[in-house]
């Protein structure tokens, strides 16, 4: 085992020989990170990426200036999908160490799950991993039901069944109930709904290779809301919350759904399929119908839903949509407290009508006349939320995954969004 490289923090500028505005310097004792008070957490995260790039795989965070947030910023930049890294953490008080340990356990689970190859993480495996994580932190306060394959069709989950039937791996709906009250009749405070497309080829509206090569990550929304519930539980969540994960592959086969097919949902809505690569909204619709039936105060869905959100925000922000201004403000306040990037994009009544079909009530994709793809996707989902104008948040997870490394992140999943949603649930 190599000796750990000591990493210390300083508010003093680096020696001028390291260059103007140098953020780190190296001496016989190790590496010093020079904080300037402007974006200290970002500076630490970027420095950790550079340290990893130097091939340093064993570090000791040394000194009294480290706290849980600074340690976490370092780990966010230091962690990568290849190789092993060891961090010797500084002495923290019990509360901060517990917070850090919970982040390491749960958000690393989210990142590792999203990074997993589709071959090893199908719909059933994703659902079971979610059950295992929540059960690990909640124990007997959790019950769940898994519905799969033809049982989905028999029970009316036509969106999920339609999308997933083209794969040999059956589609799966996970319905998980976290009920810390012990009262089976306790009201449901919140419902979380996640898109769990474990691989998205685009179906017959097939993706090009450059757009398909990262589609193992199309279950990022499901992983994010699962992690958020687990993390909220570790922070003392004492209200009943239900989790719905809509898990499927979107593949091409003789049994796959086709353009022009019409899906009839349990709420009576008929949807014409004009793009099989707009499948996420089709599976989420089933989860949102179930969520609405619980009459919760709050519904949050999360999905890697549209390329349009990435076009608007890149991979730097999650896109937020809501008709409820007060609730959107609460989510953004939670994001600010957790230092996670969210940005609200437009969602108006007219977006709900920008999905015209000649054969059904709705089309599953907008036309060239209505190019606001992220907003029309949110508008589509609103048709499956009973009281869509209040208590509903839609998160288009554009910051979930990076195809290439940048100065703050390795390639792969980020885990962003988990803490924000957990913060909102426990506020």
UniProtKB/Swiss-Prot annotation:
Places the protein is found: Cytoplasm
Annotated Mn(2+) 2 binding sites: 195, 200, 218, 279
Pfam families per UniProt: DUF3663, Peptidase_M17
InterPro entries (alphabetical): Leucine_aapep/pepB, M17_PepB-like_N, Pept_M17_PepB, Peptidase_M17_C
Recorded catalytic activity of this chain's protein: Release of an N-terminal amino acid, Xaa, from a peptide or arylamide. Xaa is preferably Glu or Asp but may be other amino acids, including Leu, Met, His, Cys and Gln
EC number assigned by the record: 3.4.11.23
List of residues binding Mn(2+) 1: 200, 277, 279
Xref: Gene3D superfamilies: Zn peptidases
Keywords on record: Aminopeptidase, Cytoplasm, Hydrolase, Manganese, Metal-binding, Protease
One GO location term (cellular component): cytoplasm
Gene Ontology BP annotations: proteolysis
GO molecular function: manganese ion binding; metalloaminopeptidase activity
Cofactor(s) the record lists: Mn(2+)
Cofactor details (free text): Binds 2 manganese ions per subunit.
Principal subcellular localization: cytoplasm
Active-site positions on this chain: 207, 281
Top-level taxon: Bacteria
Subunit (UniProt): Homohexamer.
Protein family according to the UniProt entry: Belongs to the peptidase M17 family.
Function: Probably plays an important role in intracellular peptide degradation.
UniProt-recorded name of the protein: Peptidase B
Provenance organism: Escherichia coli O17:K52:H18 (strain UMN026 / ExPEC)
């Amino acid at each position: 085992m190599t000796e750990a490289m000591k990493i210390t923090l300083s508010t003093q500028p680096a020696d001028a020989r390291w260059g103007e505005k140098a953020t780190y310097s190296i001496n016989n004792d190790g590496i010093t990170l020079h904080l300037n008070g402007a974006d200290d957490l970002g500076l630490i995260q970027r420095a950790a990426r550079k340290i990893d790039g130097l091939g340093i795989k064993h570090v000791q965070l040394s000194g009294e200036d480290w706290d849980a947030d600074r340690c976490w910023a370092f780990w966010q930049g230091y962690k990568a999908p290849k190789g092993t890294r060891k961090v010797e953490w500084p002495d923290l008080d019990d509360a901060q160490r517990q917070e850090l340990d919970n982040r390491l356990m749960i958000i690393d689970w989210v990142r590792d799950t999203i990074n997993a190859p589709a071959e090893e993480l199908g719909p059933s495996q994703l659902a079971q991993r979610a059950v295992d994580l929540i059960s690990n932190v909640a124990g007997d306060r959790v019950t769940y039901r898994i519905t799969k394959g033809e049982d989905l069709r028999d029970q009316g989950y036509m969106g999920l069944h339609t999308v997933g039937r083209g794969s040999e791996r059956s589609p799966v709906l996970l319905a998980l109930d976290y009920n810390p009250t012990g009262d089976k009749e306790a009201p449901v405070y919140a419902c979380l709904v996640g898109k769990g497309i474990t691989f998205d080829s685009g179906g017959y509206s097939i993706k090009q290779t450059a757009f398909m090569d990262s589609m193992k990550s199309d279950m990022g929304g499901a992983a994010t809301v699962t992690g958020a519930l687990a993390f909220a539980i570790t922070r003392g969540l004492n209200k009943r919350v239900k989790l719905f994960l809509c898990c499927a592959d979107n593949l091409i086969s003789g049994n796959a759904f086709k353009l022009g097919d019409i899906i009839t949902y349990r709420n009576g809505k008929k949807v014409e399929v004009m793009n099989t690569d707009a499948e996420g909204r089709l599976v989420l619709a089933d989860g949102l119908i179930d969520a609405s039936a619980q009459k919760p105060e709050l519904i949050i869905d999360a999905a890697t839903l549209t390329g349009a959100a990435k076009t608007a925000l890149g991979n730097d922000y999650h896109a937020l949509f809501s008709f409820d201004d007060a609730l959107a403000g609460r989510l953004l306040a939670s994001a600010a407290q957790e230092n996670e990037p969210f940005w609200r994009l437009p969602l108006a009544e007219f977006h709900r009508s920008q999905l015209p079909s000649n054969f059904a009530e709705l089309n599953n994709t907008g036309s060239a006349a209505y190019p606001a793809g992220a907003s029309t996707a949110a508008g589509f989902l609103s048709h499956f939320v009973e009281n869509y104008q209040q208590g509903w948040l839609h998160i288009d997870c554009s910051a979930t995954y990076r195809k290439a490394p940048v100065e703050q992140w390795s390639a792969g999943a980020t885990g962003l969004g988990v803490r924000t949603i957990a913060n909102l649930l426990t506020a």
